[in-house]
Amino acid sequence: VASCGLWYHRTLYSLRAVQATSLVIVIVDFHTHSLASDGALAPMELLRRAKAAGVSQFALTDHDTTAGYLSVRHSSEAHDVGLISGVELSCRWATTTIHVVGLNFDAAAPEMVAMVERLTNARQERAQKIATRLAGVGVHGALEGARAIARESQIGRPHFATWMSESGAVTSATEAFDKYLGTGKIGDVKMFWPPLTEVVEAITVSGGVAILAHPLKYRLTGMKLRALINDFKLAGGEALEILNGRQPDVDIKRLSQLADGCGLMRSVGSDFHRDFEYGPNVGVDVARLPDGAYVWDALETSG
Protein backbone atom coordinates (compact mmCIF):
# COMPACT_ATOMS: atom_id res chain seq x y z
CA VAL A 1 0.00 0.00 0.00
CA ALA A 2 1.34 3.40 -0.91
CA SER A 3 2.25 5.94 1.74
CA CYS A 4 0.96 9.51 1.98
CA GLY A 5 1.60 11.60 -1.09
CA LEU A 6 0.59 8.97 -3.65
CA TRP A 7 -2.93 9.04 -5.05
CA TYR A 8 -5.37 6.32 -4.18
CA HIS A 9 -5.93 3.71 -6.89
CA ARG A 10 -9.74 3.81 -6.96
CA THR A 11 -11.38 5.88 -9.68
CA LEU A 12 -13.04 8.84 -7.98
CA TYR A 13 -15.25 11.69 -9.05
CA SER A 14 -15.04 15.27 -7.93
CA LEU A 15 -17.75 17.03 -6.00
CA ARG A 16 -18.13 19.36 -8.98
CA ALA A 17 -18.98 16.38 -11.18
CA VAL A 18 -21.53 15.14 -8.66
CA GLN A 19 -23.19 18.54 -8.59
CA ALA A 20 -23.17 18.78 -12.38
CA THR A 21 -24.73 15.38 -12.99
CA SER A 22 -27.14 15.02 -10.08
CA LEU A 23 -29.24 17.23 -7.87
CA VAL A 24 -30.09 14.40 -5.46
CA ILE A 25 -27.10 14.62 -3.14
CA VAL A 26 -27.37 18.09 -1.63
CA ILE A 27 -27.33 17.43 2.11
CA VAL A 28 -25.50 14.43 3.57
CA ASP A 29 -24.49 13.31 7.05
CA PHE A 30 -22.12 10.44 7.78
CA HIS A 31 -21.52 11.02 11.50
CA THR A 32 -24.43 11.07 13.98
CA HIS A 33 -25.33 9.57 17.35
CA SER A 34 -28.57 8.35 18.90
CA LEU A 35 -29.74 7.03 22.24
CA ALA A 36 -28.06 3.74 21.31
CA SER A 37 -24.82 5.39 22.43
CA ASP A 38 -24.51 8.93 23.80
CA GLY A 39 -27.01 10.86 21.69
CA ALA A 40 -30.25 12.40 22.92
CA LEU A 41 -32.66 11.17 20.23
CA ALA A 42 -34.06 7.70 19.58
CA PRO A 43 -32.82 6.24 16.27
CA MET A 44 -36.20 6.70 14.56
CA GLU A 45 -36.48 10.25 15.85
CA LEU A 46 -33.03 10.97 14.45
CA LEU A 47 -34.06 9.63 11.03
CA ARG A 48 -37.09 11.90 11.07
CA ARG A 49 -34.88 14.83 11.97
CA ALA A 50 -32.63 13.96 9.03
CA LYS A 51 -35.61 13.72 6.69
CA ALA A 52 -36.88 17.11 7.83
CA ALA A 53 -33.43 18.55 7.14
CA GLY A 54 -33.53 17.23 3.57
CA VAL A 55 -30.72 14.72 4.02
CA SER A 56 -30.31 12.41 1.01
CA GLN A 57 -27.53 10.15 2.32
CA PHE A 58 -27.28 9.37 6.02
CA ALA A 59 -25.43 7.16 8.49
CA LEU A 60 -26.16 6.52 12.15
CA THR A 61 -22.70 6.04 13.66
CA ASP A 62 -23.19 5.25 17.33
CA HIS A 63 -20.16 4.53 19.48
CA ASP A 64 -19.15 0.86 19.34
CA THR A 65 -22.63 -0.42 18.52
CA THR A 66 -24.80 -1.03 15.47
CA ALA A 67 -27.96 -1.52 17.54
CA GLY A 68 -29.48 1.82 16.56
CA TYR A 69 -28.91 1.22 12.86
CA LEU A 70 -30.30 -2.32 13.05
CA SER A 71 -33.46 -1.09 14.76
CA VAL A 72 -34.42 1.28 11.92
CA ARG A 73 -32.73 -0.02 8.77
CA HIS A 74 -35.91 -1.47 7.22
CA SER A 75 -38.13 1.53 7.95
CA SER A 76 -39.61 3.84 5.34
CA GLU A 77 -37.72 6.68 6.99
CA ALA A 78 -34.45 4.82 6.33
CA HIS A 79 -35.31 4.72 2.64
CA ASP A 80 -36.28 8.39 2.64
CA VAL A 81 -32.88 9.54 3.93
CA GLY A 82 -30.75 7.00 2.03
CA LEU A 83 -29.63 5.23 5.20
CA ILE A 84 -26.44 3.19 5.05
CA SER A 85 -24.84 1.16 7.83
CA GLY A 86 -22.57 3.07 10.17
CA VAL A 87 -20.62 2.86 13.42
CA GLU A 88 -17.91 4.81 15.25
CA LEU A 89 -15.37 2.36 16.66
CA SER A 90 -12.88 3.15 19.42
CA CYS A 91 -9.25 2.11 19.07
CA ARG A 92 -5.73 3.11 20.04
CA TRP A 93 -2.82 4.45 18.05
CA ALA A 94 0.39 4.66 20.08
CA THR A 95 -0.93 6.09 23.37
CA THR A 96 -3.85 8.01 21.85
CA THR A 97 -7.49 6.95 21.73
CA ILE A 98 -8.73 7.26 18.15
CA HIS A 99 -12.20 6.96 16.62
CA VAL A 100 -12.79 5.36 13.24
CA VAL A 101 -16.13 5.67 11.46
CA GLY A 102 -17.19 2.68 9.41
CA LEU A 103 -19.71 3.09 6.59
CA ASN A 104 -21.66 0.78 4.30
CA PHE A 105 -20.48 -2.51 5.81
CA ASP A 106 -22.35 -5.75 6.35
CA ALA A 107 -23.57 -5.41 9.94
CA ALA A 108 -23.96 -9.20 10.12
CA ALA A 109 -20.39 -9.93 9.02
CA PRO A 110 -18.62 -12.07 11.66
CA GLU A 111 -15.70 -9.64 11.90
CA MET A 112 -17.97 -6.67 12.59
CA VAL A 113 -20.15 -8.58 15.05
CA ALA A 114 -17.05 -9.76 16.91
CA MET A 115 -15.54 -6.27 17.08
CA VAL A 116 -18.75 -4.67 18.37
CA GLU A 117 -19.06 -7.40 21.00
CA ARG A 118 -15.43 -6.92 22.01
CA LEU A 119 -15.87 -3.18 22.46
CA THR A 120 -19.18 -3.59 24.28
CA ASN A 121 -17.56 -6.00 26.73
CA ALA A 122 -14.70 -3.56 27.28
CA ARG A 123 -17.19 -0.81 28.11
CA GLN A 124 -19.02 -3.07 30.57
CA GLU A 125 -15.76 -3.98 32.29
CA ARG A 126 -14.83 -0.32 32.58
CA ALA A 127 -18.26 0.49 34.02
CA GLN A 128 -17.74 -2.14 36.72
CA LYS A 129 -14.34 -0.67 37.58
CA ILE A 130 -15.77 2.86 37.75
CA ALA A 131 -18.52 1.68 40.10
CA THR A 132 -16.02 -0.12 42.33
CA ARG A 133 -13.88 3.00 42.59
CA LEU A 134 -16.89 5.18 43.36
CA ALA A 135 -18.01 2.76 46.07
CA GLY A 136 -14.56 3.12 47.59
CA VAL A 137 -15.23 6.82 48.18
CA GLY A 138 -18.75 6.30 49.48
CA VAL A 139 -20.83 6.49 46.29
CA HIS A 140 -22.72 3.20 46.29
CA GLY A 141 -25.10 1.72 43.71
CA ALA A 142 -23.48 3.54 40.81
CA LEU A 143 -23.38 0.61 38.39
CA GLU A 144 -27.06 -0.20 38.75
CA GLY A 145 -27.93 3.48 38.56
CA ALA A 146 -25.84 4.11 35.45
CA ARG A 147 -27.28 1.04 33.75
CA ALA A 148 -30.80 2.26 34.48
CA ILE A 149 -29.93 5.58 32.83
CA ALA A 150 -28.21 3.94 29.87
CA ARG A 151 -30.89 1.28 29.32
CA GLU A 152 -30.01 -0.23 25.93
CA SER A 153 -27.29 2.33 25.24
CA GLN A 154 -23.55 1.79 25.45
CA ILE A 155 -22.75 2.65 29.06
CA GLY A 156 -20.27 5.44 29.68
CA ARG A 157 -19.24 8.10 32.18
CA PRO A 158 -22.07 10.47 31.18
CA HIS A 159 -24.56 7.88 32.43
CA PHE A 160 -22.75 7.72 35.77
CA ALA A 161 -22.75 11.52 35.92
CA THR A 162 -26.48 11.72 35.24
CA TRP A 163 -27.26 9.11 37.89
CA MET A 164 -25.02 10.83 40.45
CA SER A 165 -26.82 14.10 39.83
CA GLU A 166 -30.29 12.57 39.99
CA SER A 167 -29.48 10.55 43.12
CA GLY A 168 -28.15 13.58 44.98
CA ALA A 169 -24.56 12.38 45.18
CA VAL A 170 -23.62 15.62 43.42
CA THR A 171 -25.52 18.75 42.47
CA SER A 172 -24.97 18.39 38.72
CA ALA A 173 -23.43 16.18 36.06
CA THR A 174 -20.72 18.81 35.68
CA GLU A 175 -19.83 18.43 39.35
CA ALA A 176 -19.71 14.65 38.90
CA PHE A 177 -17.02 15.05 36.26
CA ASP A 178 -15.18 17.75 38.18
CA LYS A 179 -14.99 15.68 41.37
CA TYR A 180 -15.18 12.04 40.32
CA LEU A 181 -15.24 11.23 36.61
CA GLY A 182 -13.07 13.74 34.79
CA THR A 183 -9.50 13.27 33.62
CA GLY A 184 -7.29 12.21 36.50
CA LYS A 185 -10.19 11.70 38.92
CA ILE A 186 -11.08 8.49 40.76
CA GLY A 187 -13.61 7.41 38.11
CA ASP A 188 -11.34 8.07 35.15
CA VAL A 189 -10.74 4.44 34.23
CA LYS A 190 -8.64 4.08 31.10
CA MET A 191 -9.81 1.77 28.37
CA PHE A 192 -7.61 -0.74 26.60
CA TRP A 193 -9.04 -0.35 23.14
CA PRO A 194 -7.98 -2.61 20.27
CA PRO A 195 -5.25 -1.26 17.98
CA LEU A 196 -6.11 0.92 15.00
CA THR A 197 -5.13 -1.78 12.54
CA GLU A 198 -7.62 -4.30 13.95
CA VAL A 199 -10.53 -1.86 13.92
CA VAL A 200 -9.86 -0.76 10.34
CA GLU A 201 -9.58 -4.40 9.29
CA ALA A 202 -12.92 -5.27 10.92
CA ILE A 203 -14.58 -2.54 8.84
CA THR A 204 -12.91 -3.29 5.52
CA VAL A 205 -13.23 -7.09 5.77
CA SER A 206 -16.94 -6.51 6.44
CA GLY A 207 -17.16 -4.67 3.12
CA GLY A 208 -17.15 -1.15 4.54
CA VAL A 209 -15.22 2.09 4.18
CA ALA A 210 -13.04 3.17 7.13
CA ILE A 211 -12.89 6.90 7.91
CA LEU A 212 -10.59 8.63 10.40
CA ALA A 213 -12.99 10.67 12.53
CA HIS A 214 -12.35 14.29 13.65
CA PRO A 215 -8.54 14.23 13.16
CA LEU A 216 -7.94 17.60 14.83
CA LYS A 217 -9.74 16.55 18.01
CA TYR A 218 -6.77 14.44 19.09
CA ARG A 219 -4.60 17.56 19.45
CA LEU A 220 -1.56 15.96 17.84
CA THR A 221 1.42 17.85 16.51
CA GLY A 222 1.55 18.25 12.76
CA MET A 223 4.17 15.52 12.48
CA LYS A 224 2.22 13.07 14.64
CA LEU A 225 -1.02 13.81 12.79
CA ARG A 226 0.64 13.01 9.47
CA ALA A 227 2.07 9.83 10.99
CA LEU A 228 -1.40 8.82 12.23
CA ILE A 229 -2.95 9.44 8.82
CA ASN A 230 -0.19 7.49 7.11
CA ASP A 231 -0.61 4.53 9.49
CA PHE A 232 -4.37 4.72 9.03
CA LYS A 233 -3.99 4.46 5.27
CA LEU A 234 -1.46 1.64 5.54
CA ALA A 235 -4.00 -0.24 7.67
CA GLY A 236 -6.59 0.07 4.88
CA GLY A 237 -8.31 3.33 5.79
CA GLU A 238 -9.89 5.13 2.85
CA ALA A 239 -11.17 8.52 3.99
CA LEU A 240 -10.52 11.47 6.29
CA GLU A 241 -13.31 13.37 8.03
CA ILE A 242 -12.75 17.00 7.05
CA LEU A 243 -15.82 18.40 8.77
CA ASN A 244 -17.73 17.31 11.86
CA GLY A 245 -20.08 19.79 13.46
CA ARG A 246 -18.91 23.38 13.38
CA GLN A 247 -15.43 23.96 12.01
CA PRO A 248 -13.80 27.04 10.50
CA ASP A 249 -12.97 27.01 6.82
CA VAL A 250 -9.26 27.04 7.61
CA ASP A 251 -9.56 23.63 9.31
CA ILE A 252 -11.63 22.22 6.45
CA LYS A 253 -8.98 23.41 3.99
CA ARG A 254 -6.14 21.95 6.05
CA LEU A 255 -7.81 18.55 6.41
CA SER A 256 -8.74 18.53 2.72
CA GLN A 257 -5.10 19.07 1.83
CA LEU A 258 -4.02 16.28 4.19
CA ALA A 259 -6.57 13.92 2.66
CA ASP A 260 -5.51 14.77 -0.88
CA GLY A 261 -1.83 14.46 -0.03
CA CYS A 262 -2.37 10.97 1.36
CA GLY A 263 -4.69 9.81 -1.40
CA LEU A 264 -7.69 9.57 0.91
CA MET A 265 -11.27 10.47 0.17
CA ARG A 266 -12.99 13.11 2.27
CA SER A 267 -16.00 12.57 4.52
CA VAL A 268 -18.28 14.93 6.40
CA GLY A 269 -20.82 14.75 9.19
CA SER A 270 -22.49 16.80 11.88
CA ASP A 271 -21.37 14.58 14.80
CA PHE A 272 -24.89 15.28 16.03
CA HIS A 273 -25.60 14.23 19.62
CA ARG A 274 -28.21 16.73 20.73
CA ASP A 275 -29.41 20.15 19.70
CA PHE A 276 -26.80 22.91 19.68
CA GLU A 277 -23.96 20.81 21.09
CA TYR A 278 -21.68 20.37 18.05
CA GLY A 279 -24.02 21.89 15.51
CA PRO A 280 -27.62 23.08 15.27
CA ASN A 281 -28.97 20.08 13.38
CA VAL A 282 -28.15 17.02 11.35
CA GLY A 283 -26.98 17.41 7.79
CA VAL A 284 -24.08 19.02 5.93
CA ASP A 285 -24.73 21.14 2.84
CA VAL A 286 -22.21 19.99 0.24
CA ALA A 287 -22.33 23.40 -1.43
CA ARG A 288 -20.01 24.76 1.28
CA LEU A 289 -17.35 22.11 0.63
CA PRO A 290 -14.25 22.55 -1.56
CA ASP A 291 -13.88 20.44 -4.69
CA GLY A 292 -12.35 17.02 -4.17
CA ALA A 293 -12.96 13.28 -3.93
CA TYR A 294 -15.70 12.54 -1.38
CA VAL A 295 -16.69 9.30 0.24
CA TRP A 296 -20.24 9.30 -1.13
CA ASP A 297 -18.78 8.73 -4.60
CA ALA A 298 -17.79 5.24 -3.45
CA LEU A 299 -20.95 4.35 -1.53
CA GLU A 300 -24.02 2.50 -2.65
CA THR A 301 -27.12 3.52 -0.75
CA SER A 302 -29.10 0.64 0.72
CA GLY A 303 -32.88 0.80 0.49
Predicted ranges, named:
Residues Y8-A53, A67-A108, V116-L119, T171, ...:
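Charged catalytic cores and adjacent phosphate/nucleic-acid-binding surfaces used
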Residues N121-I149:
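Conserved phosphoryl-transfer catalytic core
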Residues F58-D64:
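Active-site beta-strand/loop signature of hydrolases that rely on acidic residues for catalysis
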Residues V113-A122, A148-A150, I186-G187:
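Flexible, glycine/proline-enriched loop segments at strand-loop-helix junctions
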